[in-house]
Amino acid sequence: MFTTLRFALVTALVLIGFLAVPALTQTAAASGTASIPTWKQELRGALTFEDASAQGGQDSGSVGPNVRVNAPQRPSPAGLLGRSETTIAVAPDGRHMVAGWNDAQGFCGVPFGAACKPQVPNGLSGYGFSVDGGSTWKDGGAPDPSLGFGSVGVPVFTRGDPWLAIDADGQTFLYANLAVHRDTGADLGVSVHRGSFAGNKFAWHDVRVFNSPRGANDFYDKEAIATDPNDAHNAVVSLTNFQELCGMPQFGFGQIEVWRTVDGGDTWLGPVIAGPEQPDSVADCGNSGTLQQSSVPVFGPSGEVFVTWQVGPTFSASGVPSTNAAIFIARSLDGGATFGTPVKVADTNSLRQDSPVGYNRARFNDHPRIAVLDNGDHQGRVLVAFPSAKTATSSSSTAQNLKSTNVLLSFSDDGGATWSAPHPVAGSVPSMGVKRFWPVVTVSSAGSVNVVYYESQEKSAPDGSNCNITIGGGLRRIGPAHSFVDTKIVRSSDGGESFGNPIKISSATSDWCAGTVNIRPNFGDYIGAATVGETTFAVWADSRLTILINGVPRNVVDVFYASVG
């Protein structure tokens, strides 16, 4: 989600358009970050407020129209800019669907204090819904914080990392997010809202929250939710816990934990550990260690639970990262109550220092995704998709790095014990200039495998302009290359062993260097897709549209949707 001091908004003056506005921080007592080095706080995925100054071939097949999901955006002082980090859940009829995203409008007013309207926003996690298969969308804002009074006694304000799922009943949507107390900014851990359609309207009915038993000594981040497709009572949430080490609050490098419900979300049980803190982190009390982040859960056909996540890079005590990382998985045979020993899926070259040049944050998450085939010739096959840099890179995150990255897939036919060698889902990439990343793997009812991903062509702009991006900490990434990004999909009919030619989903290319936003990261940390029947539904961040800011057309980052039949 947005970056650096988590949900801290630096105590510096931040310019919104031409207005100087104080960006507030959560207090040290509430966040526990006072003694944590800045480079280490940036391991977390939290959204931060951002200046809205300038940021600088395939047959379309059966791709449906590209539709903007969110309402038109307005610049300060009427609003704040930026809608990204997308997620989607779709009902069995393929017509009723809910999308979610990080929404910069949530920085207005309490608890963040940005000067804009309205002064009482609902949250940093927006949502929209459609009742006609995505032809039209209604922007719902964010879930009403006052829903929290009825279930947890406080107003629950979502603060990003949105993740949607739909229950096995095909009617109840679950929306997981990080959360804080609306009035005080106190950390609440994770929230899960439940909602449903009634006619042509959608509403959230209630919310539950859960947090580390050790309270502010630990910090929850990057949650993701999955539901059991065969039992509406069961769902799990995996997350990263930056836990206390050696008496130092929130000083760990990430432990992967899981919470579960067996009553449809009325109560949540946990946490249990799927990926223990890495031994080097524990041995050095978190002064140096190996990052664990970006977990995603999924249910198998027999009720088993799999969780995948990124392990690495390893950081020195001064914050210098290694170039290597790996993808791991853990399995539970009792619905998420306990997990076996984690298993390595594959080694990777971390993308941390190899982001698209138009990305407005100094570091980049690898973020693997997971699915399980529950039909077809390969029923029970577990699939994990992930990106990897073409070659290891340790270049400075302030420099433009044009080394290519690719999307790979591995699969397991023995419940995650052993894994196939990773192979590209969309062919090879050159050594420089093409970045494929943030894949989402989904499966169809007939057993096909679908992978949606971003592809960025890192090249000079036709007008010869530089890409000039603020990346936090007073730093900029400046250079001649731009990030020209499209959303694509590949499909496999043999269980992920081979894929057809890529299909371009986005009907217009986004220049990530041109998006004008009030959030960091400008395009989020992941994208969303779901497959129902044989149709894949995708939502992504897109900067094709412009609005007038002080009389000048400026690109803004919206959420776009399309289906692929």
Locate predicted features.
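Sec-dependent signal peptide cleavage junction
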Residues: 22-30
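Bacterial N-terminal signal peptides
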Residues: 10-22
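C-terminal PAP-associated
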Residues: 29-565
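Bacterial N-terminal signal peptides that target proteins for export
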Residues: 1-10
